[in-house]
Amino acid sequence: MSIKFSFKDEVFSLDKLQLPSRHYHFNDNENYIKLLNIGEGIFPKDKIRTSLSLDNSNLIFTTESATKIYPSKKEYGIQKIDIVLKNNSNLEFINDELILYKDSRYIQFFNLKSDENSTFFYTDILSRGRSFENFDFSNMLIKNSFFCEKSMEYMEKFDVKGAELKDYINRKSSSNFIFAKIYIKTNNNEEFLNRIYLEKFESFTYTKNKKIILGVISSNNMFELKNQIFKIWELYRKELNKSKFNLGKQ
């Protein structure tokens, strides 16, 4: 199952839709796509691919709601996301949280390729599951790859078992159990990182070649966590001389 779309010179094109989903494209002031998966989740054996290309274009992209990963005895639900940015493009990908149900198994492949002058803001959020669960999923495998100017700039791999993550948080005696990872590329990363520090977000740093900024934030409240993300996103938009944007979600 897949969806593939692109923008060239700010013009939208839906290239493929073989996915039980709806997408909403708005263009009052900026290109904005909200993607709604029917059933709002990923089931065992699902293989979902999202492909996006921007050429001299800007896009704000988000999901309608949290992505639920349903239980499985042995099969994995798989999601693959491929993104290409070129010719001064800008992507702002505001992801809602993953909710891994008890006994769920999930694999994610995320690949982003950007040229020198394009920019992006991308977030991933992991919750502890449904309100009555506490990292009771079986296994989560993540591979995120970022390329800048055709060279690998950053890659991370996670093989996480719910029981191990729960044990780690308990040993750390942390009250926070919701985590967000943020990936940012601007045209002046040094200046933007200093701006983040001034706002008291301290868990941010560069990748090896300083072409991407990485950050982690955590909280025990989803509303509070998303407010932190939106604050950093607002700083990013100011860096691009853009005003605050309302996603129009609860």
Swiss-Prot record:
Swiss-Prot/TrEMBL keywords: Chaperone, Cytoplasm, Nickel insertion
GO molecular function: nickel cation binding
Pfam families listed in its UniProt record: UreD (PF01774)
Subunit structure: UreD, UreF and UreG form a complex that acts as a GTP-hydrolysis-dependent molecular chaperone, activating the urease apoprotein by helping to assemble the nickel containing metallocenter of UreC. The UreE protein probably delivers the nickel.
Family affiliation: Belongs to the UreD family.
InterPro entries, sorted: UreD
Function per UniProt: Required for maturation of urease via the functional incorporation of the urease nickel metallocenter.
A single Gene Ontology CC term: cytoplasm
Protein localization: Cytoplasm
Record protein name field: Urease accessory protein UreD
Top-level taxon of origin: Bacteria
Lineage: Bacteria, Pseudomonadati, Campylobacterota, Epsilonproteobacteria, Campylobacterales
